[in-house]
């Protein structure tokens, strides 16, 4: 498993903080945004990260010397200053278990705990599309979130799914919204407020300033407006879900 760590992100929406990219092999097949051609492939997929410069960078991770092995990446995270804000995975997901071919949607618990331990005392956050119907996946995410230093958000693709994942009680939740969704007043079917990503709605806002996705015990769902090359197609799919 290879990971690339950029110490100062050049993405204005993220801000000048460390950001990582994990090779596409980490993405679970349960991710509904994945291309039929596989993770990291732009053809027919809806994942914003598969397109443009980020997509080109992502597809090179683990090739031609780009990125480092997981253990070296974790050592680099451990060396970050105390309270350092950082984003894990502008593309990619949690490390995947390869103990059995049937386990392709099961996270690698050992590697996940290695990361959460390395991030102790930091202010990291990430997102996962792994299937939370798996008891192991739920247990790993819950334990990762018990460690002070890395917040794992569960990614949902409808407001009703956001409710379901929030009710698990193991992690904060984010949801993908159609690109033309209102910026205020959205609630889930169970009444949870949805805060549309401030970096998408405010010109002077970035992840480095907002930090909302890093808050573990928040009551709100963070909503991300569909964006990127496939946003129109993805928005059409999302509009029919709730």
Task: Give the role of each language-model region.
Residues 1-242:
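Class I S-adenosyl-L-methionine
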């Amino acid at each position: 498993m290879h990971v690339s760590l950029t110490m100062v992100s050049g993405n204005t929406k993220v801000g000048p903080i460390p950001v990582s990219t994990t090779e596409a092999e980490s993405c679970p097949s349960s991710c509904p945004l994945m291309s039929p051609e596989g993770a990291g492939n732009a053809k027919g997929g809806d994942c914003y990260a598969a397109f443009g410069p980020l997509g080109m960078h992502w597809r090179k991770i683990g090739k031609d010397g780009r990125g480092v092995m997981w253990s070296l990446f974790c050592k680099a995270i451990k060396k970050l200053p105390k309270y350092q804000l950082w984003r894990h995975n502008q593309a990619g997901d949690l490390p995947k278990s390869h103990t059995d071919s049937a386990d392709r949607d099961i996270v690698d618990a050992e590697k996940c705990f290695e990361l959460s331990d390395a991030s102790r005392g930091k202010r990291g956050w990430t997102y996962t599309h792994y299937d939370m119907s798996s008891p192991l996946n739920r247990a790993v995410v819950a334990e990762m979130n018990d460690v002070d230093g890395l917040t794992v958000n569960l990614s949902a693709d409808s407001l009703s799914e956001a409710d379901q994942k929030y009710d698990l009680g193991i992690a904060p939740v984010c949801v993908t919204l159609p690109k033309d969704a209102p910026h205020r007043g959205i609630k889930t079917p169970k009444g949870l407020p949805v805060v549309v990503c401030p970096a998408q709605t405010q010109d002077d806002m970035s992840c480095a300033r907002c930090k909302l996705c890093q808050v573990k015990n928040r009551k709100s769902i963070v909503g991300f407006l569909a964006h990127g090359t496939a946003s129109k197609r993805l928005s059409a799919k999302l509009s029919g879900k709730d």
